[in-house]
Amino acid sequence: MFEINPVKNKIIDLSDRTSVLRGYLDFDAKVERLEEVNGELEQPDVWNDPDKAQALGKERVSLEQVVNTIKNLEQGLEDVDGLLELAIEAEDEDTFNEAVAELDELEQQLEKLEFRRMFSGEHDACDCYVDLQAGSGGTEAQDWTEMLLRMYLRWAESKGFKTELMEVSDGDVAGLKSATIKVSGEYAFGWLRTETGIHRLVRKSPFDSNNRRHTSFSAAFVYPEIDDDIDIEINPADLRIDVYRASGAGGQHVNKTESAVRITHMPSGIVVQCQNDRSQHKNKDQAMKQLKAKLYELELQKKNADKQAMEDNKSDIGWGSQIRSYVLDDSRIKDLRTGVENRNTQAVLDGDLDRFIEASLKAGL
C-alpha cells in the first residue's frame, strides 16, 4: 500500500502557498488589468504610438504569466486531489504515482512564481545595461573582460533574454578594454542587479611565457533602462560629444563608418558609448538614454549610501566591492557575499550563473 498522508499534506501545503501568493501578487487586480490591456491592444489605432503599443504588449506578457500560473496551480491542485481519491478507491499504484508526479510539477511552477517576490525593487522589471571595464592586470584583465562578456551573453541567451552589443573597445593585444550590452526581457534588471562589483580572476596566464599565476580584475556595473517619463536634467554645456569610427570586436555587427558616439558627462566623469547602429543620430540618442539611466542609478545609490555605510556587514556601493572570485587552477568559483561555490568553472563561464544570482537575491543584496 502506498503512503497517502504525505501526499495529502503536500497538496494542503501547496494550496496554502498558492493562496498566499494570490494575495501577495494582487491576483484580482492583475486579472482586471489584463482585461484592460487586452482591450487597449485590440484598438485599431494602438500602433499609432509604437512605444506605447510595445509597452502594453510587454505588460500583457507579464500579467499573463502571473494570472495563468495561479489559475493553472489552483486547477492543477484540484485535479491532483481528485486523482489521488481515485487511486485510493481503486488501490491503483500507477494512478497514485501519476498524482505524485503532477504534484511535483506543480510545486516547481509554484517555486518559480514565489521567486518573483525577490523582484520587489522599483526598477526590477526594467530592461538593463551591463557595463564591463577591464581593471588592473593589462592584457590578462582585458582577456578576462571578454570572458565575462561571453559569460553574460550566454547566461542571457539561456534565460530567453534579448541582448544588444552597444559598445566594445578592443584590448591592446587581446580581449577588451570595455564593453556595454543591453539586456531586454522580463525582470532583466531584477535578475542582474546584484552582479555589480569587481570580478577577480586567478589563473596561469596564457600570455605569460613562464606560465605563472596571475590575478586580474574586471568591473561590472548594471543599471536599469529608465522610463522616458522620468525627468533627468542634463545641461548640454556639461557634455563633451565625440564621434569616431567603430573598431570593436563585433565583426559584421559593428559598423565601420564614423558614426560611433562617445558622450562624457563632465561633472560626474561618466562616459557612455554607442556604436551598434549605422546612424550617428541613432547612436547619439541611445548614448543619451544610457547616460540618463546611469545618472539615475548613481543618484539612487548615493541616496542609499548613508544608510548602507551604517551597516558594516554590507559591501560598499559601486565599483569598489569584490563580489566573486574565479580561481581556475583550483577549479573553484566563489561568491564572496553569499559563500556559494561552484567547482564546475567551465559551466559558470558558459553562463551557468543562476545559483549565484538566486542566492544573492534571497540574501537581499
Curated annotation (Swiss-Prot):
Database matches in SUPFAM superfamilies: Release factor (SSF75620)
Location of N5-methylglutamine modifications: Q252
Keyword Cytoplasm: yes
Pfam families: PCRF, RF-1
Further details from the record: The gene for this protein contains a UGA in-frame termination codon after Leu-25; a naturally occurring frameshift enables complete translation of RF-2. This provides a mechanism for the protein to regulate its own production.
Family (UniProt): Belongs to the prokaryotic/mitochondrial release factor family.
Protein name: Peptide chain release factor 2
Organism: Haemophilus influenzae (strain ATCC 51907 / DSM 11121 / KW20 / Rd)
Gene that this sequence comes from: prfB
